[in-house]
Amino acid sequence: MQYSTLAGQTDNSLVSNNFGFLRLPLNFMPYESHADWVITGVPYDMAVSGRSGARFGPEAIRRASVNLAWEHRRFPWTFDVRERLNIIDCGDLVFSFGDSRDFVEKMEAHAGKLLSSGKRCLSLGGDHFITLPLLRAHARYFGKLALIHFDAHTDTYDNGSEYDHGTMFYTAPKEGLIDPSRSVQIGIRTEHSKKLPFTVLTAPQVNEDSVEETVRKIKETVGNMPVYLTFDIDCLDPSFAPGTGTPVCGGLSSDRALKILRGLTDLDIVGMDVVEVAPSYDQSDITALAGATIALEMLYLQGAKKD
């Protein structure tokens, strides 16, 4: 049977399922596939505190990824990731728009079903709140996780709200999903609490240190734990990523962020996401292109393990 939505569910979304990442054909039955990594769009932005519009992020990232699809051996890598990994795009998560509780249930269930069938998840947001249900699914499967978190904000705020894109990494340690003492936050340049023992590498620090020193600190922190990797696009300076809900000046360049990512090849990264691309604030699609490039680099990290 041919489906046009994930698992053939009724989907009334107006922003979903145009075409796949890197021009991949959409595969709406990912659980039965032979995929190594499954890309899922997550058009959810009901937890934002600033400008909305990240629900259009998956579509924008996929559209920008067309600019990357032609390069079989992506520079500076020496292989084509599509020859090393079986990657599929299963389209967008189906949930009741306007119902955050339903979203959380559907996100956890989808990721859990993929993991239990031997797949790994790369999720395209969507606002950063999507990471919390993803962490729940991954911790249930892999146990307590280390977190590598690129962002302008620590997202460790405690404002009492159940659904907020600034509270996930306050909630996740409380639920035992991540070990903050083995987790690192990169690119931070906003006020934040120091109550939780995260290793915080501020944007000025990362911009002044060598890439090698930053990578060393990340690896020293997470060690050999299973790692969840999350990249909020506002980690980048607004000159490189204006199309996001809460931009903050003084961030990382795209070049520096990519070089840091490339240094993480030997870590046990078990789940990944790219979040907070909001294309209505973008200029010439540079934020969407940054998001697509980061997502592709994440996949190359996984392909490099096949050496």
Swiss-Prot record:
Q: Which GO terms describe its molecular function?
A: agmatinase activity; manganese ion binding
Q: Does the keyword Zinc apply?
A: no
Q: Name the family.
A: Belongs to the arginase family. Agmatinase subfamily.
Q: Organism's domain of life?
A: Bacteria
Q: What is the protein's species of origin?
A: Neisseria meningitidis serogroup C / serotype 2a (strain ATCC 700532 / DSM 15464 / FAM18)
What PANTHER family does the database record attribute to this sequence?
ARGINASE/AGMATINASE, GUANIDINO ACID HYDROLASE, MITOCHONDRIAL
State the protein's name: Agmatinase
Q: Which GO terms describe its biological process?
A: putrescine biosynthetic process from arginine, via agmatine; spermidine biosynthetic process
Pathway(s): Amine and polyamine biosynthesis; putrescine biosynthesis via agmatine pathway; putrescine from agmatine: step 1/1
Provide the coiled-coil residue spans: none
* Record: residues binding Mn(2+): 128, 151, 153, 155, 232, 234
For this protein, the parts annotated as crossing the membrane are none
Pfam assignment, any one: Arginase
What InterPro entries does this protein's entry cite?
Answer: Agmatinase, Agmatinase-rel, Ureohydrolase, Ureohydrolase_dom_sf, Ureohydrolase_Mn_BS
What does the record give as cofactor? Mn(2+)
**Catalytic activity, per the record?**
agmatine + H2O = urea + putrescine
